[in-house]
């Protein structure tokens, strides 16, 4: 996995991982439930209330995020998450210091701030407190050490391992054998039968995995610089449309023409005319000025906060964010659209 250059976008993503879904602030004494959701211990205590008196029966409390029953005795201290909270705070503080900068080495872009030297006493205390091996020291502005285990783990957690659902794919689309790639099928390709799940006008496919709670992220590789005179929607001229990447609610219309916008349960960006556009309503929003679309687009879904954000997958610079007034209210799936055999899209395998 290529580690992105350290910057505000990366720190923001790390902070999102270190944020309690109940209070919206950094985790304090985080605990892990049986369903794998984490909360501040005090936040969960307020949510669940006091335990029943000894000898009396108590209904099993449920997870505030997913609703799964989670006995109190199943709570565990999330030590690794506590370490990550400390690290994300440290990165934010150090990034704000005068003279903080990043660098590059060996063609890869890796966090390279000398002020993140793990010889720093505060950082050493953090690692030792949680019984994590202290990384090798470095006195120069070199790369973050390769054996920096918790930071690497945090970065690996930033992407989910997803596949595409061929049952939803428009009949003009071809899904790769590993169910991660999609392209417009060449002439002569056998056409599958129509079904209620399948898009019949929008050349789109949904992910096989949907989300009804939590924070999730996936990356999509695009055909950078491609610019084609075709349409995302069959028989509809949308100009030089090439592809769209984003997320769609389970209720998204599968039949007929669809306007790609949040009111239709679609949050997406579109590569068109050599530019990247956020598919807002009533008109799309141009992103990045004259710069070409990135080769890799990262989609961040924060279900409870109603936020779908898009980042440059290499630099982690924020491209655009859709914000709903509250939780998204339904299961949300990855969405990929493409309209030309020269413009394939591919979900990048997640690393865990």
UniProtKB/Swiss-Prot annotation:
The keyword Transferase applies. GO terms for molecular function: ubiquitin protein ligase activity; zinc ion binding. A zinc finger (RING-type) spans 20-67. Residues 98-118 are annotated as: Disordered. InterPro entries: B30.2/SPRY, B30.2/SPRY_sf, Butyrophylin_SPRY, ConA-like_dom_sf, PRY, SPRY_dom, TRIM/RBCC, Znf-RING_euk. It catalyses: S-ubiquitinyl-[E2 ubiquitin-conjugating enzyme]-L-cysteine + [acceptor protein]-L-lysine = [E2 ubiquitin-conjugating enzyme]-L-cysteine + N(6)-ubiquitinyl-[acceptor protein]-L-lysine. PANTHER family: E3 UBIQUITIN-PROTEIN LIGASE TRIM (PTHR24103). Plays an inhibitory role in anti-RNA viral innate immunity by targeting the adapter DDX3X and promoting its 'Lys-48'-linked polyubiquitination. Alternatively, enhances the cGAS-STING pathway activation by promoting 'Lys-63'-linked ubiquitination of STING1, facilitating the STING1-TBK1 complex formation and STING1 activation. This is RING finger protein 39.
């Amino acid at each position: 996995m290529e580690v992105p250059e350290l910057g505000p976008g990366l720190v923001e993503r790390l902070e999102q991982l270190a944020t309690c879904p109940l209070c919206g602030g950094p985790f304090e004494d985080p605990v892990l439930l049986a369903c794998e959701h984490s909360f501040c211990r005090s936040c969960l205590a307020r949510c669940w209330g006091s335990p029943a008196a000894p000898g009396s029966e108590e209904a099993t409390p449920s997870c505030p995020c997913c609703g799964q029953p989670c006995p109190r005795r199943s709570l565990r201290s999330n030590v690794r998450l506590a370490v990550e909270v400390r690290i994300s705070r440290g990165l934010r503080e150090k990034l704000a210091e005068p003279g903080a900068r990043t660098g590059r080495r060996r063609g890869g872009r890796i966090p390279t701030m000398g002020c993140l030297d793990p010889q720093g006493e505060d950082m050493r205390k953090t690692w030792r407190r949680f019984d994590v091996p202290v990384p090798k020291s470095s006195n120069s502005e070199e790369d973050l050490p390769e054996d920096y285990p918790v930071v690497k783990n945090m970065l690996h957690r930033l992407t989910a391992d997803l596949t595409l659902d061929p049952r939803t794919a428009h009949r003009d689309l071809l899904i790769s054998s590993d169910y991660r790639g999609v392209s417009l099928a060449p002439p002569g390709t056998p056409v599958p039968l129509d079904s209620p799940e399948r898009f019949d006008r929008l050349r789109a496919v949904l992910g096989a995995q949907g989300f009804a709670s939590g924070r999730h992220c996936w990356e999509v590789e695009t055909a950078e610089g491609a610019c084609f005179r075709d349409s995302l929607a069959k028989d509809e001229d949308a100009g030089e449309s090439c592809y769209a990447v984003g997320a769609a609610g389970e209720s998204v219309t599968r039949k007929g023409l669809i306007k790609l916008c949040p009111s239709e349960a679609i949050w997406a960006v579109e590569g068109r005319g050599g530019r990247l556009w956020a598919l807002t309503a009533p008109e799309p929003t141009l992103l990045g000025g004259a710069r070409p679309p990135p080769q890799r687009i990262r989609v961040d879904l924060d279900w409870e906060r109603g936020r779908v954000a898009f980042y440059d997958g290499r630099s982690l610079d924020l491209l655009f964010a859709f914000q709903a007034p509250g939780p998204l209210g339904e299961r949300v799936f990855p969405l990929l659209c493409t309209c030309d055999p020269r413009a394939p899209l591919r979900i990048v395998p997640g690393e865990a």
